[in-house]
């Protein structure tokens, strides 16, 4: 058994970690890294060619951390270059642009690509040996925001990922993200390479998360309640009661649950007005 003295000795050793960035082109991956490491913002877009590699040292929880950062190009053209860099990673920064819905919807594809490269033995829904931080970037942008905070937070937290609202341009949220990100990686390393159970507990169920997403994306009141057009009053009320119990804000802590609950109430009211 490892002695307490040995653990203290190991905790004083510099910790070496590998971090990668993932996300579509032009979402701000490189800018986020430069803002944190170099304290500057590069306004002119410069596409990452393949992989950008950098090393930085940080102090977290009285530990010196040597971070090897692999900033991966987001363009599909560079898949053959970046596919070699997924292995032996302790941390992943997933970035999307809040003004580009497609960049948010592509996050699942990025996780699938990572799973493919790590092998079939990896369960992407239970990656407890890697810390993920999701950056909802460009919150300073003047263009219309397509992905609101509750939607991004729900997607992230339902997978046990950290979630942050960031702006590489203004610096908002950047330091907080990296501090929490690195701190979680230190906890992972100190826990034998697995995230502590407390860090994975999300506080809401997959059924709740899936219901909120379905309600958010529904095309009409029928679809929102999950009933077919022409359903009876009893069928509408039954569907409503099930969702109301599942998503009531007093019982559900999932991001977006309050808005989803209100939408369900309004959908029921609208449908019952037209049913005799």
UniProtKB/Swiss-Prot annotation:
Compartment list: Nucleus
Pfam families recorded: DnaJ, Ras
UniProt keyword annotation of Secreted present: no
One Gene Ontology term from the biological process aspect of the record: phagosome-lysosome fusion
Top-level lineage group: Eukaryota
UniProt entry keywords in alphabetical sequence: GTP-binding, Nucleotide-binding, Nucleus
Stretches assigned to the J domain: 220-276
One function term, GO molecular function aspect: GTP binding
Matches recorded under SMART domains: DnaJ (SM00271), RAB (SM00175), RAS (SM00173), RHO (SM00174)
GO cellular component: late endosome; lysosome; nucleus; phagocytic vesicle
List of residues binding GTP: 23-30, 71-75, 137-140
Similarity comment: family membership: Belongs to the small GTPase superfamily. Rab family.
UniProt xrefs under PANTHER family: RAB FAMILY, RAS-RELATED PROTEIN RAB-7A
Record's function text: GTPase possibly involved in regulation of the MEK/ERK pathway.
NCBIfam families: small_GTP (TIGR00231)
Protein name according to UniProt: DnaJ homolog subfamily C member 27-B
């Amino acid at each position: 058994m490892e002695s307490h003295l040995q653990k203290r000795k190991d905790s004083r050793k510099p910790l070496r970690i590998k971090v990668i960035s993932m996300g579509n082109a032009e979402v701000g991956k490189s800018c986020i890294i430069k803002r944190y490491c170099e304290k500057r913002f590069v306004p002119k877009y410069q596409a990452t060619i393949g992989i950008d590699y950098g090393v930085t040292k940080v102090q977290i929880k009285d530990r010196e951390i040597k971070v090897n950062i692999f900033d991966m190009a987001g363009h599909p053209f560079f898949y053959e270059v970046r596919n070699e860099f997924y292995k032996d990673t302790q941390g992943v920064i997933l970035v999307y642009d809040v003004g580009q819905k497609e960049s948010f919807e592509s996050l699942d594809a990025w996780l699938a690509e990572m799973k493919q490269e790590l092998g079939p033995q990896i369960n992407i829904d239970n990656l407890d040996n890697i810390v993920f931080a999701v950056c909802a970037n460009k919150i300073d942008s003047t263009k219309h925001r397509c992905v609101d905070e509750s939607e991004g937070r729900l997607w992230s937290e339902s997978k046990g990922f950290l979630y942050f609202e960031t702006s590489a341009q203004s610096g908002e949220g950047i330091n907080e993200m990296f501090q929490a990100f690195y701190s979680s990686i230190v906890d992972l390393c100190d826990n034998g390479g697995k995230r502590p159970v407390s860090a994975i507990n999300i506080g809401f169920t997959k059924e709740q998360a899936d219901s909120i997403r379905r309600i958010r994306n529904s095309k009409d009141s029928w679809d929102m309640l999950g009933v077919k057009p022409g359903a009876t009053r009893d069928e509408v009320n039954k569907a409503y009661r099930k969702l109301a119990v599942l998503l009531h804000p007093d019982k559900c802590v999932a991001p977006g649950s309050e808005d989803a609950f209100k939408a369900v109430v309004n959908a029921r009211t609208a449908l019952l007005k037209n049913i005799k």
